[in-house]
Amino acid sequence: MQKINDLKILFFDVGGILLSNGWGHESRKKAAVKFGLDYAEVDVLHNFIFNVYEIGSITLDEYLDTVIFNYPRDFVRQDFKDFMYSESVELPDMLQWLKEWKKDCGFRIISINNEGKELNDYRVQKFKLHKAFDAFISSCEVKMRKPDPGIFKLA
């Protein structure tokens, strides 16, 4: 039997722990107000297709075609994407603490997260998540989402 002292890997989520959720309901509500969208309709369409986006089966543009740009709009796609990205913010204290702690902790730290590729890539680059994690197991790359047991078996 393995002793707890032998464990050398820690798994972290990103959304809601270190950063805001990538594209949570609060952000979608803000988008509805900012861009004059019907939130109830956006929410139904989002729930219909977002899992497919998170496992990397469609791109962000394809997600947006289904959920936002299924009608002519008086705003452009890039403005909407910029808004989506701007909703990713660092939560107080945790990320900086993890980056510092990781330097001498002796553990491998691995991120397991449900993120679409474009949002995942943006967040890794913008918040320099490579300084906090040794590896990423992202739903968009492994074609499975938490809580699918398969994603944890990969870890």
Predicted regions and their residues:
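Generic structural signal for small/hydrophobic residues in well-ordered secondary structure
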Residues: 13-16, 56, 101, 111, ...
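Short, conserved loop/helix-junction motifs that constitute active-site signature segments
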Residues: 4, 102-104, 128-132
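Substrate-recognition "cap/lid" segment bordering the active-site pocket of phosphatases
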Residues: 117-155
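A metal-dependent, Asp-based hydrolase signature
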Residues: 51-81
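Active-site neighborhood of HAD-like aspartate-dependent phosphohydrolases
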Residues: 2-45
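Alpha-helical elements of Rossmann-like donor-binding domains used by nucleotide-donor carbohydrate transfer enzymes
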Residues: 26-30, 48, 62, 66, ...
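Short, acidic loop-to-helix structural element flanking the phosphoryl-transfer center
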Residues: 6-9, 69, 78-110, 121, ...
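Short, solvent-exposed loop/turn segments at secondary-structure junctions
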Residues: 17-18, 24-25, 115-118, 142-143
